[in-house]
Every structure is written in structure tokens, then in C-alpha cells.
């Protein structure tokens, strides 16, 4: 049988052994194939990946891609595919009112594989952005339509991973709510047997108190923010409760954004052995192609590489870990035979690059992870002429 695509001479990252393996990758249709079962290694298309690292298609676990339904969202295929990202999780752009529109108009037709968190706010983030007429969402639990949220979740469990809440001072401080948005969201999630994803930047609670409400596989989003209550205590130590939470399976996602990353918090935590479980962008129209504070998942990955995080751990945080949380283990985030032929071919380049955090603090780096080609569902969707 003849291959459709053969990627030869590339190095594959062994996440368990922290080593590189010389391995050819074969594609037939939309699947990666076991080359031991192929008699003839001839292929319709051959990509010479010499000097490159062949990775599973990258997974951006936190972004906003309800393109056309919210003012802040990006077109996933345009922004993701040239940057090696073939799967994405939308972090609560839609609520129960507009989720079906999101699914029909964006999720279904997109090449990028998209799963989502359902916002507890009825209309999701549709009020954000749009200039002076935009406004923050109303997180008053009195307005949660629990029946409709449950109905939407139960009808779409193949796509919806859990409930999303933005729990920050600018949204809820001083509001006279009869009940707390976080406690109401947690209660509803437990009742519906699902997880939560909580935006914690400038949270209404200290991190060591907030984290008590998180279970295994709940998402602590923007874990390295430096606004208000961070994961560091007054002595600059990562709270013991935060470390314990990671041990019991709470997922800490950096979800960078333009307003959610602080070098001091990140470096201090990493020096103490506390690393993010997931590396993601929080892509929006504001921060994707318009600023280098985020720009792309590869740019954020490169920042962690220059902060000293192992390349193999970085790759795990954008492949294996998010694939499991998306309930797509073995399908994406892997180059194993039978998996979806989602592939990113990257090169580690030695070049000077500057990274900047929310507060304008800069890091001068000397390494960059650069995308050379992307395959999605077995199709070459981006490729440089020369690597």
C-alpha cells in the first residue's frame, strides 16, 4: 500500500524518556499508520524533516473562537493552523442561549478540532469587546438558568467539557448577590457531574481559600497572573494548598492572555518546582496577531523554554495532558498509529527574542520554537517552502 504522505528524517520527542528518536511518520487518509505494516515506503508526498522535530498537532486548551458570535473571538482555522495548532478548547465564549449557534457555525465547519466550556452566564461573553458599547458579563447566580444549562450540557456532552466562570474583582466586587458566583457554579457542576474552569485573575478569594473548591480535572485558569491574589503567599512561597491541589489532580493552566501573566509569579513558582500542567494562550482578537505578548501557542511555549522549563514537559502540556482532558486520548496529542494525522513540524531556532508580561517586564531569550509545517486530518494545511 502506498502512503499518502511520508515525513522522513525528523526527530520525534519521547516524552517519557526525555529523548529524541529518529522516526519516519506515515499517513494514509486522515490517520497515522504503522510503517511496519506498509510494504512500500513510497508516498504521494514526501516531506524531508531533517533538522526538525515532528510533534503531534498542538492543542491550545484555552482560547476564544466563537468567531462571528462574540467581538473578542478569532477565526480558529486562520489563527491556529499556521502555528501548528490543530485542536482547541473554547473557554466559555458561549452560554446556553448561543451555544448551539457556536456549535453549528464554528465548531462543526472548522478544520481545527474544537471542544468547549459552557459559560454559566446565559449569553456567554457576547457582551465583551465591541468598543465603548461592550460591557462585562453579569455573573449574578440569580440569573443562572440551571435547567437550560443542564439541558445544553446533557445534550452536548460529546463537546462540552464543563462549566466556565470568570471570578474576578472587576466583574463581581461590591455586587449585592444573594449567593456567591463561584459557590453557585461549583454546586451546579457537582450536581451535573461535570468539571469547572475558573478564570482566577484578581479573584475575590485568596488562592489558598479559592483552591479548596477545586476537584481533580477542574481548571485553575491563569495560574501565573500577578493581579490581586496570586498563587504566592506573603513570603513569596507557593501556597501549600496550591501544591497539594496539583498533587490531587487540579489542573493549573497558564492561559497567558495579555492580562494574566507575571514573570515574577511564574519564575518564583517554577524555581520552587511548581510548573503549569497546561500551556495555553487565551487567544482573542486583541492578543493573537496584534501583540507579541501572546501571538501564538508556539510563542508562549518558547517563553517557557527560555524560562527553563524542559522542552519535553512543554510538549506534554500542549499534547498529552490536554488530549486527556478533552477525552480524546489516543486520537489527538500523539503520533501513535491509528491517531488522527494531526502533525506539527517545528524547528528549534537560535535567535534573540524578547518576551513581555502583563506589566511590561521583559525577558531576553535566545531560543524559539518555529513552525515549519502543519498537517490536520491528514491534509497539509501549512508548509514553508524551505525549512
Residue ranges, per PLM feature:
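Active-site gating/metal-coordination segments in enzymes
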Residues: 131-180, 221-223, 229-230
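Active-site core of metal-dependent hydrolases
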Residues: 167-290
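Metal-associated gating/positioning segment near the N- to mid-region
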Residues: 41, 49-109
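Hydrophobic faces of well-ordered beta-strands that scaffold small-molecule active sites
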Residues: 57-63, 88-90, 114-118, 161-165, ...
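Metal-cofactor-binding active-site regions of metalloenzymes
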Residues: 83-89, 93-94, 109-140, 164-167
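His/Asp/Glu-enriched, well-ordered alpha-helical/loop segment
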Residues: 265-348
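Histidine-rich, glycine-flanked metal-binding segment
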Residues: 1-55
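C-terminal cap of metal-dependent C-N hydrolases
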Residues: 340-386
Amino acid at each position: 500500500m502506498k502512503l499518502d504522505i511520508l515525513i522522513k528524517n525528523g526527530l520525534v520527542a519521547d516524552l517519557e524518556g526525555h529523548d529524541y528518536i529518529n522516526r519516519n511518520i506515515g499517513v494514509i487518509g486522515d490517520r497515522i499508520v504503522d510503517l511496519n505494516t506498509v510494504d512500500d515506503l513510497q508516498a504521494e508526498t514526501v516531506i524531508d524533516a531533517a533538522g526538525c522535530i515532528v510533534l503531534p498537532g498542538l492543542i491550545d486548551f484555552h482560547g476564544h473562537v466563537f468567531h462571528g458570535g462574540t467581538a473578542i473571538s478569532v477565526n480558529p482555522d486562520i489563527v491556529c493552523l499556521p502555528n501548528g495548532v490543530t485542536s482547541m478548547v473554547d473557554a466559555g465564549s458561549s452560554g446556553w442561549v448561543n451555544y448551539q449557534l457556536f456549535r453549528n457555525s464554528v465548531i462543526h465547519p472548522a478544520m481545527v478540532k474544537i471542544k468547549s466550556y459552557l459559560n454559566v452566564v446565559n449569553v456567554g461573553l457576547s457582551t465583551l469587546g465591541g468598543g465603548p458599547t461592550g460591557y462585562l458579563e453579569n455573573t449574578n447566580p440569580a440569573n443562572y438558568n440551571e435547567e437550560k444549562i443542564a439541558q445544553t450540557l446533557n445534550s452536548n456532552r460529546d463537546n462540552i467539557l464543563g462549566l466556565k466562570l470568570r471570578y474576578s474583582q472587576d466583574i463581581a466586587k461590591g455586587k449585592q448577590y444573594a449567593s456567591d458566583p463561584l459557590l453557585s457554579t461549583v454546586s451546579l457542576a457537582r450536581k451535573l457531574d461535570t468539571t469547572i474552569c475558573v478564570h482566577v485573575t484578581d479573584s475575590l478569594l485568596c488562592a489558598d481559600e479559592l483552591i479548596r473548591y477545586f476537584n481533580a480535572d477542574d481548571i485553575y485558569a491563569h495560574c501565573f497572573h500577578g493581579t490581586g491574589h496570586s498563587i504566592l503567599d506573603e513570603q513569596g512561597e507557593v501556597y501549600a494548598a496550591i501544591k497539594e491541589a496539583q498533587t490531587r489532580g487540579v489542573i493549573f493552566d497558564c492561559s497567558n492572555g495579555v492580562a494574566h501573566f507575571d514573570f515574577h509569579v511564574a519564575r518564583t513558582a517554577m524555581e520552587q518546582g511548581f510548573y503549569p500542567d497546561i500551556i495555553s494562550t487565551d487567544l482573542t482578537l486583541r492578543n493573537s496577531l496584534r501583540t507579541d505578548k501572546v501571538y501564538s501557542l508556539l510563542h508562549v511555549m518558547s517563553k517557557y523554554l527560555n524560562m527553563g522549563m524542559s522542552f519535553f514537559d512543554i510538549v506534554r502540556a500542549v499534547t498529552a495532558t490536554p488530549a486527556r482532558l478533552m477525552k480524546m486520548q489516543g486520537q489527538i496529542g500523539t503520533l501513535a498509529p491509528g491517531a488522527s494525522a494531526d502533525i506539527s513540524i517545528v524547528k528549534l531556532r537560535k535567535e534573540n527574542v524578547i518576551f513581555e508580561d502583563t506589566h511590561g517586564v521583559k525577558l531576553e531569550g535566545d531560543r524559539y520554537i518555529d513552525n515549519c509545517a502543519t498537517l490536520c486530518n491528514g491534509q497539509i494545511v501549512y508548509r514553508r517552502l524551505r525549512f
